[in-house]
Amino acid sequence: MTNPLLTPFELPPFSKILPEHVVPAVTKALNDCRENVERVVAQGAPYTWENLCQPLAEVDDVLGRIFSPVSHLNSVKNSPELREAYEQTLPLLSEYSTWVGQHEGLYKAYRDLRDGDHYATLNTAQKKAVDNALRDFELSGIGLPKEKQQRYGEIATRLSELGNQYSNNVLDATMGWTKLVTDEAELAGMPESALAAAKAQAEAKELEGYLLTLDIPSYLPVMTYCDNQALREEMYRAYSTRASDQGPNAGKWDNSKVMEEILALRHELAQLLGFENYAFKSLATKMAENPQQVLDFLTDLAKRARPQGEKELAQLRAFAKAEFGVDELQPWDIAYYSEKQKQHLYSISDEQLRPYFPENKAVNGLFEVVKRIYGITAKERKDVDVWHPDVRFFELYDENNELRGSFYLDLYARENKRGGAWMDDCVGQMRKADGSLQKPVAYLTCNFNRPVNGKPALFTHDEVITLFHEFGHGLHHMLTRIETAGVSGISGVPWDAVELPSQFMENWCWEPEALAFISGHYETGEPLPKELLDKMLAAKNYQAALFILRQLEFGLFDFRLHAEFRPDQGAKILETLAEIKKLVAVVPSPSWGRFPHAFSHIFAGGYAAGYYSYLWADVLAADAFSRFEEEGIFNRETGQSFLDNILSRGGSEEPMDLFKRFRGREPQLDAMLEHYGIKG
């Protein structure tokens, strides 16, 4: 039986990959990697790019190309068999990574290269790749005594297992709660689109009625529109206690102990490497210089946003009392009455906009924006092997008709697919030893409603923004001009700069000039009418301060959790959250809420002591976009400058240098505050 993962491929043969292929393929790739490292080191000095970095990059690339589709399938097409195979590979990968990071001979080879004459002949990207490699050796404990190195390896392996366990618990808990509603009266107030989706969910399970789930496209409409307060409360409880010791499935997929162990091990790891705590370690590879700078940034932002947030909530309470006689707003009432107030103030609702954002309009509109700014054209290919019939595949070409990169687009929520939206790399750009250039490939994944009742998929404006956001990451990866592995595309980009291209792209979703072709009624093709557009723009900053305060709550919680960890006191997760809420939250939340238990970004993603990156990059993105506002949002020269200075440079230079080259100065906070309508 041939193993499709071990047969050379341009693009992953998704339909042929079975769980039993995973462990043998990864094991073989890891053995090849180890042999290669030993062979490269054994040849002795003088080490050059060609005899050291290039061969290692190529064999690493093979490993990445084998593991990337496996890891991706684990996220979008999870099954018990695949999950088990994936779990078996995690310790193998972690052990290999530690082995490389603590390989004395390899470390010495890199140091010889950096200290020798050859280093001066390398280009900027190659120098950066060598410098990063040396930094990563330090961060893998290369300088530690043997027993500490061994402990580092044990911690790293355990952390990768715990992150995976956390993620599985969240997925299982999300899928582990559903509610069948047979009486439509219980769903009064719900938009037709949500009812149709819930009905389709039930039919797929051969049930009569409406099936509600904790997936966002099912959960949000209930919280926002359903008149039935008891149902809102029931769903809110189920959602905000996922994977915890509370709620309807209390204790079943509980992440409490998992989080505590993760935080304790991260702290121990940081201290092994000589850092005071994990926040310091996290910043060793980021733009921000030290924890105090991050805390000052977040605290300053909170001071500016809080008074406005309090005002927004007071107005909502007054509105709910005056119009609906509600004396006390419960947490499950906030979204519901906010929507009512938004309609009252601006006579507009998300649902009114939905018919104007059918999938084909939104996707093609996105491509049109990219064409106007960067001269890049997207072309669909139908002959590519995908993991689900709904997945589409596109290639990007520039004005010289050169293929720059390609991507998979997987837009709809499904069972066994993890929630949220994300971009990931499938293949990175790299110049190979034989002179050929391997082009980048990306995965773009969202969780939107699928088409129902013969209508196309209709998106909310928020979903269109999400699509643009993820595509911004995609462009960063696919339009790279860097040909050095490790610093091309999104590789090697500091985490607090990685959200710049994505948040930057969101701006076009608010521009009348762009909305003229991003929108079009699914029946008539008519673009968003001016009257609706004006209302949408007027409502743009509705509750903007509350939104920022929520982001600050997440960012401060994450950062302080890591910066203030004390082994003798344990993690103090709920206590820390309560303290942060006192500082920044204005909306009350119940004591049984268990937000941290499903905060995958920091416990199972790359945002540990790094969630602040969203707000940090928001400052960069708003300021970068303000140049477009000055020079024209479809100004090709401005677009080219952003492409040349930021998007195409990958991780080859420091983000601040790249930003200054584009903007002509350091970033300023004003543009972001103005963007959210917050008085500085």
UniProtKB/Swiss-Prot annotation:
Cite the GO molecular-function annotations of the record. Answer: metal ion binding; metalloendopeptidase activity; peptidase activity
Q: What is its EC number?
A: 3.4.24.70
The family database entries (Pfam families) matched by this protein are listed as: Peptidase_M3, TOP_N
Annotated function: May play a specific role in the degradation of signal peptides after they are released from precursor forms of secreted proteins. Can cleave N-acetyl-L-Ala(4).
InterPro entries according to UniProt: M3A_DCP, MetalloPept_cat_dom_sf, Neurolysin/TOP_dom2, Neurolysin/TOP_N, OpdA_N, Pept_M3A_M3B, Pept_M3A_M3B_dom
Please name the catalytic residues of this protein: 470
Q: Which reaction does it catalyse?
A: Hydrolysis of oligopeptides, with broad specificity. Gly or Ala commonly occur as P1 or P1' residues, but more distant residues are also important, as is shown by the fact that Z-Gly-Pro-Gly-|-Gly-Pro-Ala is cleaved, but not Z-(Gly)(5)
The cofactor note from the UniProt entry for this protein is:
Binds 1 zinc ion.
Residues involved in Zn(2+) binding: 469, 473, 476
Q: Which domain of life is it from?
A: Bacteria
Q: Does the keyword Hydrolase apply?
A: yes
Asked whether the keyword Iron-sulfur is assigned, the reply is no
UniProt record, GO biological process: DNA replication; peptide metabolic process; proteolysis; signal peptide processing
Please list the cofactors this protein needs.
Zn(2+)
In its UniProt entry, what is this protein called?
Oligopeptidase A
Q: Which GO terms describe its cellular component?
A: cytoplasm; cytosol
Q: Which PANTHER family match?
A: PROTEASE M3 THIMET OLIGOPEPTIDASE-RELATED (PTHR11804), SACCHAROLYSIN (PTHR11804:SF84)
EC top class, as a word:
hydrolase
Q: Which family does it belong to?
A: Belongs to the peptidase M3 family.
Please give the CDD domains that the UniProt record associates with this protein: M3A_DCP
